[in-house]
Design a protein with these regions (language model features):
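N-terminal Rossmann NAD(P)H-binding glycine-rich loop of SDR-like oxidoreductase domains
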Residues: 1-22
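Short-chain dehydrogenase/reductase
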Residues: 85-89, 128-140, 167-170, 174, ...
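NAD(P)-dependent short-chain dehydrogenase/reductase
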Residues: 147-152, 156-196, 201
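A hydrophobic C-terminal alpha-helical subdomain
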Residues: 187-188, 258-311
Length: 358
């Protein structure tokens, strides 16, 4: 029996698809029902003693559970920083307490971006992102120190399914990519060669399933694209090529190095001259893309035992196009395509993307 938290989320849905083939699944959920016949739901609160359950319920749950996959997390960076920390750190402590009672290993879903600590200036400007990364770093430490077996899982940004492109919820990065397709992003923070490390949800779920089936109960695993991650200019050009299926190729956004964003652009647009909607949008993009600005690629455990095959640039580009196709058919509000969309087989046309020098 696998206890899963976060089953109603993007990754949680993919984990149910993957794990329900071989495991009975009990989903702890708070407000949002999972509504999936393949699982049994238990309403609980990770921030309450004994998960908010009666003593007998808690003890029966502990006696039943054999494996714990803790995927629930506060991921909205617009939330109060204190609430982000409580959800991500205290919720992890609660799962470790249950694991100790159950004698079960914990598979803790962290994030690859713990490897990108923010500078003091960035922490002050983006308190939500800072709280999220700090809480994930602290949660990893309590997993390491816990008296139960623990596996730390570090996915990068989780995108939709690699085959269908579908995703359970609209992610911030999906909105940004959709805005590029619509030609609504004149300026984009980040260096052209920054790696936008994204991994399809089914790839992450397959790796987690492989670790559970393989009996792996310790270690740290990077569920990332690693050195194969698409560069920011490649992501932009793929979006522009996709948009050509619906009409004229949008004007490419200017890519502004992050140091110029902090030193020049953010102070400028935070003045009274610019509309509030423009300030909010650019601030969101700057915060979202902040974590991708690193010199070296992430490590990747994909391709190692139990974790499934490694990803290639071509596979990632194809997955991105399928994600854009699913987005356009759903919430994207795009017209019917004028031709069938095909992933670009070669390198994206980076010459179309212009860099504004610092």
């Amino acid at each position: 029996v696998v206890l899963l938290t976060g089953g109603a989320g993007v990754l949680g849905r993919a984990l149910i698809d993957e794990l329900s083939q071989d495991f009975r699944i009990v989903c702890l959920r708070h407000r949002t029902p999972v509504n999936d016949r393949r699982v049994r739901e238990v309403r609980a609160d990770l921030l309450e003693p004994q998960l908010g359950l009666h003593k007998g319920e808690f003890e029966r749950l502990a006696a039943e559970v054999e494996l714990i996959v803790h995927s629930a997390a506060a991921t909205n960076w617009k939330s109060d920083p204190g609430s982000i920390r409580r959800a991500n750190l205290d919720g992890t402590v609660a799962m470790l307490d249950l694991a100790a009672r159950a004698g079960a290993p914990v598979y803790h879903m962290s994030t690859a971006f713990v490897a990108n600590p923010l500078a003091p200036e960035e922490q002050e400007r983006f308190p939500g992102a800072a709280a999220y990364l700090a809480s994930k770093t602290a949660a990893e430490q309590v997993v390491r120190e816990a008296p139960v077996p623990g596996v730390i899982l570090r996915p990068s940004v989780v995108m939709g399914d690699s085959v269908t492109g579908r995703i359970a919820g609209m992610q911030g990065l999906t909105r940004a990519l959709g805005a590029i397709v619509k030609g609504q992003v004149p300026v984009l923070p980040g260096a052209p060669d920054a790696r936008i490390d994204m991994v399809p949800q089914d790839v992450v779920a397959r790796a987690v399933g492989g670790l559970l089936r393989g009996g792996v109960t310790e270690g740290e695993y990077w569920l990332t694209a690693g050195a194969e991650a698409l560069l920011q200019r490649e992501v932009v050009d793929t979006c522009l090529e996709f948009a050509e299926g619906y009409g004229p190729r949008p004007h490419p956004p200017r890519l502004i190095p992050l140091e110029s964003v902090h030193r020049l652009l953010l102070p400028l647009i935070e003045g009274p001259t610019f509309p509030e909607s423009l300030r909010r949008r650019f601030h969101t993009y700057a915060e979202l893309l902040l974590v991708f600005q690193r010199a070296l690629p992430f490590e990747s455990s994909l391709g190692s035992p139990h974790c499934g095959p490694a990803l290639s640039k071509d596979a990632l580009r194809q997955a991105l196009v399928r994600n854009l196709t699913a987005w356009s058919a759903g919430r994207g509000g795009m017209r019917a395509p004028r031709r069938t969309q095909q992933p670009s087989p070669g390198a994206a046309r980076s010459t179309e993307t212009r860099e504004l020098a610092s």
